[in-house]
């Protein structure tokens, strides 16, 4: 899929994309991505995946049944996700989403045949500030790669919440409790949902989203994330 990324004129690329890799900040970027160097791309592909976690039988029980992550949340992934979200590099969704699709396919091949993709939503205010929803962009790339149905607005944030990164585990859970609601009740009963986000830390956000999806009738909610902290 990386080979299918749109090729832009070189002079325009030099204006839009960095001359050096977003991870190492040293090597020239690869012509395949224009954002990462070949060495860092190869390192990402070779890195072991975090073990998939089944959450349905944990204590206390969670609404999220399992979570699958492409990478650990190390320095390299932190740099990429920071650039993606805060340095406004939405084009990273195509690269990271394609790599994630390749890494997770064999672990989810059976579920992919029947599941529906749903991104974790941003509040309208934060969406205006950022200009895009990183989870929705990732979900769209996964939908193309896996030929899956996506419901980009199946969930909404019912209230503005503080950014989770600044909070403790207990504060994160309280911050997002009851903050999500389903807008697609007719399409969710008896469905398996792939819930897409960028990072899984304590799971508070994804669990709150999963609770809303199950209230709307979903039978299984599986988290799909770039990285797990």
Can you annotate each of these PLM segments?
Residues 1-229:
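Glycine-rich phosphate/pyrophosphate-handling loop used in enzymes and phosphotransfer proteins
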